[in-house]
């Protein structure tokens, strides 16, 4: 029997289910709009989808509790209807969101897997054992790949800036201007500030391309310090960080939030050509989340050595996606440390080690790993956001 998408509004192509906290998404465009239904029944397989705007967190549930309870009440005796919450772009710690859904499931006595969550967060798969069906795929990664296909072989020019992807020969042939590259759009996050303070403390800030686009002082500066070796005394350098102000590499976010460089495709090729190593700071840095955004994958497409400061088991997850790590350069034992401060400390220790190896050692490492680096780039382009959406729709039908 053909699966249908239930829509609350006759004007469903313009007004989403759950508006205004939800919007129309790829599930609608790729399937739902061609298979709509406007009345619920207890026979046909029906999807009632809510594509959440922003993070899937407890606040969005609490703010719309009465409405959501009315939704669950309508399907409590109809196991053929699946309530789906989907988000392909935001996936930071979703545990409180799932806790709310479990309460709803129990209150309305819903069937196992009648609630479905479609998410970018790998860690959320743990909630399958609580009767919530979790469909996880690296959607943001796939979204990046589909954008990068346009510049895979041919660069484009934007006001004198080359937008394109670096290859291994260009990495080796390009004259380097800095050792590190690190994009840090939002430096209100403690772990990103700690990285920049660490670069300042160790005299590496001037040998790094560092973007700083969002700042504020709404946090406890004492959280910047730790007894861990690499993190000790970082707060002393906060004033220097504050004096830096904003630092724009290409996307002038402070003045133009919708600048062309906000588009995923617009990658400044020279940033990768001019540097030896990429320090990637992910969106989240948790031990109960595993949310990789496009940030973790750009280095593969640009043939650039890297280390990610992110959620626990981030690098392990990359391996599960078919990428090879650089074990002859980096000790990844920090990756599985549940203590966030210890994980950050040891990651910084590895970054220090990479810098101490020196330029010649990094180039030799690169030459010895060219086939691996090429293979990772090929693996990158084997993924596709559109295929992930098609596979998701198939899984919803099961």
What is the predicted function of each stretch?
Residues 2-280, 286-293, 300-398:
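Pol beta-like nucleotidyltransferase catalytic core
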């Amino acid at each position: 029997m053909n699966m249908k998408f239930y829509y609350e509004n006759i004007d469903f192509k313009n007004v989403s289910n759950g508006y205004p906290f939800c919007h129309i998404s790829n599930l609608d465009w790729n399937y739902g709009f061609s298979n709509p239904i406007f009345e619920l029944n207890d026979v046909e397989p029906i999807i009632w989808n809510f594509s959440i705007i922003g993070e899937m967190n407890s606040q969005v549930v609490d703010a719309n509790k009465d409405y959501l309870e009315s939704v669950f009440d309508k399907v409590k005796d109809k196991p053929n209807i699946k309530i789906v919450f989907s988000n392909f772009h935001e996936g930071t710690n979703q545990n409180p969101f799932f806790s709310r859904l479990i309460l709803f499931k129990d209150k309305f006595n819903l069937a196992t897997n009648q609630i479905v969550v479609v998410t970018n967060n790998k860690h959320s798969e743990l909630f399958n054992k609580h009767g919530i069906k979790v469909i996880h795929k690296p959607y943001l990664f796939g979204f990046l790949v589909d954008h990068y296909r346009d510049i895979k072989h041919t660069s484009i020019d934007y006001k004198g800036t080359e937008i394109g992807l670096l290859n291994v020969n260009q990495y080796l042939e390009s004259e380097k201007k800095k050792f590190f590259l690190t994009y840090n759009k939002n430096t209100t996050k403690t772990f990103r500030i700690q990285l920049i303070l660490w670069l300042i403390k160790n005299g590496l800030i001037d040998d790094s391309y560092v973007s700083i686009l969002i700042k504020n002082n709404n946090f406890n500066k004492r959280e910047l310090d730790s007894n861990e070796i690499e993190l000790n005394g970082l707060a002393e350098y906060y004033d220097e960080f504050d004096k830096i102000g904003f630092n724009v590499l290409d996307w002038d976010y402070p003045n133009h939030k919708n600048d062309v460089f906000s588009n995923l495709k617009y990658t400044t090729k020279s940033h990768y050509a001019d540097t030896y190593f990429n320090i990637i700071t992910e969106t989240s840095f948790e031990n109960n989340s595993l949310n990789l955004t496009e940030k973790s994958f750009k280095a593969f497409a640009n043939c650039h050595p890297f280390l990610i400061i992110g959620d626990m088991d981030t690098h392990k997850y990359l391996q599960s996606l078919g990428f090879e790590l650089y074990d002859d350069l980096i000790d990844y034992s920090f990756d599985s440390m549940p203590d966030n401060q210890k994980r950050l400390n040891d990651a910084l220790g590895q970054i220090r080690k990479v810098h101490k190896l020196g330029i010649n050692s990094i180039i030799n490492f690169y030459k010895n790993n060219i086939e691996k680096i090429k293979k990772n780039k090929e693996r990158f382009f084997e993924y596709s956001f559109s295929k992930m959406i098609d596979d998701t729709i198939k899984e919803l039908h099961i």
